[in-house]
Amino acid sequence: MEWLVKKSHYVKKRACHVLVLCDSGGSLKMIAEANSMILLSPGDILSPLQDAQYCINREKHQTLKIVDARCYSCDEWQRLTRKPS
């Protein structure tokens, strides 16, 4: 299943991206943590490869690995993206 990036936040301290992903129909929304050397932007499309790897915008040489995923909640998004005090 392809995923559309709706929101993207890079967590420098953990060196990972936190993403809000939506399926093509817009009915399924997830929060995913991913490892990637490439910055992701809203509107990017993630296409599945294998072993939790995805290519970015159907470019097979631009990949990321999903390390954690969960159902979307506003509280969880705020927790993951807030600045440390």
From Swiss-Prot:
Recorded superkingdom: Bacteria
Cited NCBIfam families: PRK15450.1
Classification via InterPro entries: PmrD_dom, PmrD_sf
Membrane-spanning residues: none
Free-text function comment from the UniProt entry: Interacts with phosphorylated BasR protein to mediate transcriptional induction of BasR-activated genes to induce polymyxin resistance.
Designated name of the protein: Signal transduction protein PmrD
Pfam families: PmrD
Keywords carried by this UniProt record: Antibiotic resistance
Organism the protein comes from: Salmonella typhimurium (strain LT2 / SGSC1412 / ATCC 700720)
Family: Belongs to the PmrD family.
Cysteine disulfide partners in this protein: none
Induction: By PhoP. Repressed by BasR.
GO BP field: response to antibiotic
